Amino acid sequence: MKLRLLLIGLLTLITSVTFASELSHWKPLLSVDELHELLEEDPFAATVVDIRALDAKEPDASYNAGHIPGAISSPYATWRGQPDNPGKFITQDKLTWLVQALGAEADTPVVVVHRGDSYSDFGAAARVYWSLKTAGLTNLAILNGGFQAWKQAGLPISTELETPLPSDFPAQIQPHWLAQTAEVEAYLNKPGVEVLDARPDSFFAGLSWHPAASKPGTIAGAVAFDNERWFHSGGPLLESPERLQ
């Protein structure tokens, strides 16, 4: 019995050390080379979540057409609110179901992979990242450049459907990651507080708008900061840290 307990203890220690080593260079934004190296060392080092549609007519637009080996399909549409208000955060029950379907726990390293055709695809990945963080997950990252960057780097691609064992993680919405209408309204009257409108400039100016929007325009007092500015030439890759600063 003592020998068995000793072996279990050693295995636990080895697993913990390996896990800590894998996360020693973990960061919220991973390059394709960094993710590939991580998965080469251990295919189970991170849960890779592909948020593209399962099927699509356009080449490379769908999970079934090809994905990062081991990646799990979790289409972006499932992370959005109802059609009349897609920007609204999903219910806690749905959030729990989505997280458990990934087989994820609170400390599971998760990498979100978007299509990678334009900067707007990164926005979809950021929405899922935010949702997972709001659910209570702590080790999260987005693949810089998305699936297109992975493919263009000539890295392995699989067409095998991954079906992980569901977890029993009890997702709890962390309210400090959400801003309610009343809170935003209160902040608008406080000195030193800025509300940034990261939508396209045409949305801010009221020249165009989402079909679900009740009216064109922006929040009174908001500052325009089109999120396209963060990306290199309007593509899917974030600018260098030096330029972002």
At which residue positions do the language-model features occur?
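Positively charged n-region of N-terminal signal peptides that target proteins for export
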Residues: 1-5
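Bacterial N-terminal signal peptides
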Residues: 6-16
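Cytosolic catalytic domains that perform sulfur/thiol-centered chemistry
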Residues: 19-245
